[in-house]
Amino acid sequence: MKEVTAVVRPNKMSVTKDALDKIGYRRMTAIPVLGKGKQRGISGELNFYIQPKLLAKRYSTGMKYIPKRLLSIVVNDEDVDQVIKTIIGVNQTAQIGDGKIFVESIDEVIRIRTGEKGELALK
């Protein structure tokens, strides 16, 4: 099993959720987060035109964090590529700030309510 963690734009959350639902992944954890990357907190992420004076002020006062959504999905090993392709497919705009995907191994999953383990706990 793998945990696929994706950091995506908030305005892409609905289409991401719908696309994952279509391939059978309805269960996920979504957390509002703040972050900064190559866009240094000044991209079109906030949907306003940045004037040169504002840009200079932004850099002189430090970087601002941009709202993002962090998605965590635990998937079977054989589904990892499909989940990644799905997330990329609906989030890729070719612009800085599209996000990142991280994949980590999961040793065990246990459903608290029933005590089921492994793949049974994911169903």
Swiss-Prot record:
Keywords: Nitrogen fixation, Transcription, Transcription regulation. Disulfide bonds: none annotated. One of its GO terms (cellular component) is cytosol. Pfam families: P-II. The keyword Transmembrane does not apply. GO terms for molecular function: ATP binding; enzyme regulator activity. It comes from the Archaea. The keyword Transferase does not apply. One of its GO terms (biological process) is regulation of nitrogen utilization. Could be involved in the regulation of nitrogen fixation. This is Nitrogen fixation nifHD1 region GlnB-like protein 2. It comes from Methanosarcina barkeri. The lineage of its organism: Archaea, Methanobacteriati, Methanobacteriota, Stenosarchaea group, Methanomicrobia.
